[in-house]
Amino acid sequence: MKDFIEWKDFTFQYDVQSEPTLKGINLSIPKGEKVLILGPSGSGKSTLGHCLNGIIPNTHKGQYSGIFTINHKNAFDLSIYDKSHLVSTVLQDPDGQFIGLTVAEDIAFALENDVVAQEEMASIVEMWAKRLEIAPLLSKRPQDLSGGQKQRVSLAGVLVDDSPILLFDEPLANLDPQSGQDIMALVDRIHQEQDATTIIIEHRLEDVFYERVDRVVLFSDGQIIYNGEPDQLLKTNFLSEYGIREPLYISALKNLGYDFEKQNTMTSIDDFDFSELLIPKMRALDLDKHTDKLLSVQHLSVSYDLENNTLDDVSFDLYKGQRLAIVGKNGAGKSTLAKALCQFIPNNATLIYNNEDVSQDSIKERAERIGYVLQNPNQMISQAMVFDEVALGLRLRGFSDNDIESRVYDILKVCGLYQFRNWPISALSFGQKKRVTIASILILNPEVIILDEPTAGQDMKHYTEMMSFLDKLSCDGHTIVMITHDMQLMLEYTDRAIVIDNGLIVADDHPINILSNTELLKKTHLKKTSLFALADRLGISPQKLTQWYIDNQGGKNG
């Protein structure tokens, strides 16, 4: 069926805003198509999704003109009940989606509403839990899970409903690399088995292209810039021009001078012909040179129950100005480690900070040494307005109004938030809220800054601005610790990586060496970047190609 979902000359403006967010949209999606929606933060892609699932106009009010239909019916005339049977949504923020007290109850919620028999309900819940590898979590509270585990629970909760339209709002944001690849494979299988019209809003382009996508729609400033096949999009400069991170191998091949015009298939490295490509001389890998030791963590163990340690006798050192990535699969203990370092949870570690034993710090004392930016911005925000949230730490420390205004404006500009300085935080997107929380910590200038998934939900422009800013802090002597699932970030912007698996440090090395260890990657759910696959095709050392790429395009300031 053609035009299953259709927008004709569609414009939408929120009541709280002076300009339309969507401007004259013309887009048709046939039944059963799989479409990727791209765009920088604030481009209108999430607003389009909210129109589709009924959040607009039922929750977010505004004015619209033009036509928007689902299955040839005016979408805004459909009741919430009717819309819920048409569209199932996996939200960007999984905490906003939970209903049940346990994982099993949450997955079963839609089935309960449809009065499914209890025995059949239990069977369906168990099936989806196994397929998403969350069966051991069925009795746990969703709020107690890691970010990636929460996303899997949210996904299971909508997949049980068999809706004809599946909407995924950044489903990979909190998933480790291998789990992200697995989820995209699962989404593709569901798309084919159920013939569901599948719409994916996502920044992690390289991971989405792991499976086939019928079409890509690129948004910018509320308008459609590109609407067509993925292969043709990758031949253009639209991605970099409009703030979307290109697949690593595409960026590398552009720097190598590869002629894309003769290339038909762009989404698979295996389909490229490199017989005429000239490879420049590439230097050996830069190894990390330790500076002065800043923090020594000794024998850190954390247990949430009497039987199992979430962290088991973890010891490591941090150095001044170092950029460290902490990586590992979902639930490995990465966020628990950060919380323990900040004294948020009880632990028995010995911490030596600048040659002083600070093991008995209060939370306030520890906060003056180590700043922590949480993965979920909603857990940090306490003020109604953007300016007040970023200024709060300075006000509590007695800074003058003039000094506060100057420093807040400076940090808001760095974080790409200056235009929102007088906005209510409730009007911001999830990615914009994330930048607000990062700004509120960075403004206090702590010597160690821990960031849990600092770039999740960020477009390329704000990703680059944020990482360049963190690079500058590193050059100024700050130690930057990033908990991340982003292997490209780890390669470009860190000097060292610690891999955690089941509460243990299983590797501590240069990021390139980590990604060269195939057995380690498989065990810990990490994944080589496409630079390694490209190096294999080119017949050169992946270490040299990665170092060459970093020299030409990556983080250089550290």
UniProtKB/Swiss-Prot annotation:
Keywords, in A-Z order: ATP-binding, Cell membrane, Membrane, Nucleotide-binding, Repeat, Translocase, Transport
Species annotation: Streptococcus agalactiae serotype V (strain ATCC BAA-611 / 2603 V/R)
Function: Probably part of an ABC transporter complex. Responsible for energy coupling to the transport system.
Bilayer topology: Peripheral membrane protein
Subcellular location: Cell membrane
Positions contributing to ATP 2 binding: 328-335
Name of the protein in its database record: Putative ABC transporter ATP-binding protein SAG1633
E.C. no: 7.-.-.-
One GO cellular component term: ATP-binding cassette (ABC) transporter complex
Family according to the record: Belongs to the ABC transporter superfamily.
Keyword Nucleus included in the entry's annotation: no
An example Gene Ontology molecular-function term: ATP binding
